[in-house]
Curated annotation (Swiss-Prot):
Name of this protein: Protein lifeguard 2
Designated gene of the protein: FAIM2
Native organism: Homo sapiens
CDD domains hit by this protein: LFG_like (cd10428)
Cellular component aspect of the GO annotation: endoplasmic reticulum; Golgi apparatus; Golgi membrane; membrane; membrane raft; postsynaptic membrane
Molecular functions (GO terms): calcium channel activity
PANTHER family: BAX INHIBITOR-RELATED (PTHR23291), PROTEIN LIFEGUARD 2 (PTHR23291:SF18)
Gene Ontology BP terms: apoptotic signaling pathway; cerebellar granular layer development; cerebellar Purkinje cell differentiation; cerebellar Purkinje cell layer development; cerebellum development; negative regulation of apoptotic process; negative regulation of extrinsic apoptotic signaling pathway via death domain receptors; negative regulation of neuron apoptotic process
């Protein structure tokens, strides 16, 4: 008994109080801790786990709410995500590099088309055996016209073949060869001086119109209705001339028609040039490089043929 009393008496002071406190901690129910004071919250002290209730589950945002500024995010480069993406999936004409690549591609194709056509015209103009053969066999002319019309409708009306390689280049090659044959055969009926003169006039006019279209602030793409009316006027004028031609040839009426045609397609050249540039009311998609080259090529060829009818002199 004495030892027991001594053992109890020999306990360190405060031990019994600690056991009581531990017992109270085990038996007392959990009470949520009080929120920290303003000073503790602002100084970062007193921020213990369990001081606040758990955050609610995330609510999915509407796409229009979750806006990210591309210029302030490291995952964007020049407004586009840095991951794998198509170059032209999200296209902006404000990108000067994309515009230059597109215009360069169109004019490269156009240059090849014009060189092929120039070679055919030179062959039909300077080589007498070839010139005599094509004039003696008009069936090739109508066959080339049918091929030209079919390929033109395919490229102009069907976006699938026009945009998919290699069908777009194959169709454009066939179209260019057929149009070159038609232009060369028409040139074979005029003397060499007239052909060279009209080639020079066409080159100067097309170069001037192209530079003007790039520099002017006037938007030709907003005048498509006016150009369509002029084109219909030209079409019906040509139809009337075709009806009157078997009965009587009127030189001045034919000259007016040729001047009207050259003027209309000069305006169309300005329109098609501005469609390549962007920064206008209407612009071509960067996938339409075949369509852009096709339109400008036709404009230049029609300008040349109308100048040939206006200034050319037939061979004797």
């Amino acid at each position: 008994m004495t030892q027991g009393k001594l053992s109890v008496a020999n306990k360190a002071p405060g031990t019994e109080g600690q056991q009581q406190v531990h017992g109270e901690k085990k038996e007392a129910p959990a009470v949520p801790s009080a929120p920290p004071s303003y000073e503790e919250a602002t100084s970062g002290e007193g921020m213990k786990a369990g001081a606040f209730p758990p955050a609610p589950t995330a609510v999915p945002l509407h796409p229009s709410w979750a806006y990210v500024d591309p210029s302030s995010s490291s995952s964007y480069d020049n407004g586009f995500p840095t991951g794998d993406h198509e170059l032209f999936t999200t296209f902006s004409w404000d990108d000067q590099k994309v515009r230059r690549v597109f215009v360069r591609k169109v004019y490269t194709i156009l240059l090849i088309q014009l060189l092929v056509t120039l070679a055919v015209v030179a062959l039909f103009t300077f080589c007498d055996p070839v010139k005599d053969y094509v004039q003696a066999n008009p069936g090739w002319y109508w066959a080339s016209y049918a091929v030209f019309f079919a390929t033109y409708l395919t490229l102009a009306c069907c976006s699938g073949p026009r945009r998919h390689f290699p069908w777009n280049l194959i169709l454009l090659t066939v179209f260019t060869l057929s149009m070159a044959y038609l232009t060369g055969m028409l040139s074979s009926y005029y003397n060499t001086t007239s052909v060279l003169l009209c080639l020079g006039i066409t080159a100067l006019v097309c170069l001037s119109v192209t530079v003007f279209s790039f520099q002017t602030k006037f938007d030709f793409t907003s005048c498509q209705g006016v150009l369509f009316v002029l084109l219909m006027t030209l079409f019906f004028s040509g139809l009337i001339l075709a009806i009157l031609l078997p009965f009587q040839y009127v030189p001045w009426l034919h000259a007016v028609y040729a001047a009207l045609g050259a003027g209309v397609f000069t305006l169309f050249l300005a329109l098609d040039t501005q469609l390549l540039m962007g920064n206008r009311r209407h612009s071509l998609s960067p996938e339409e490089y075949i369509f852009g080259a096709l339109n400008i090529y036709l404009d230049i060829i029609y300008i040349f043929t109308f100048f040939l009818q206006l200034f050319g002199t037939n061979r004797e």
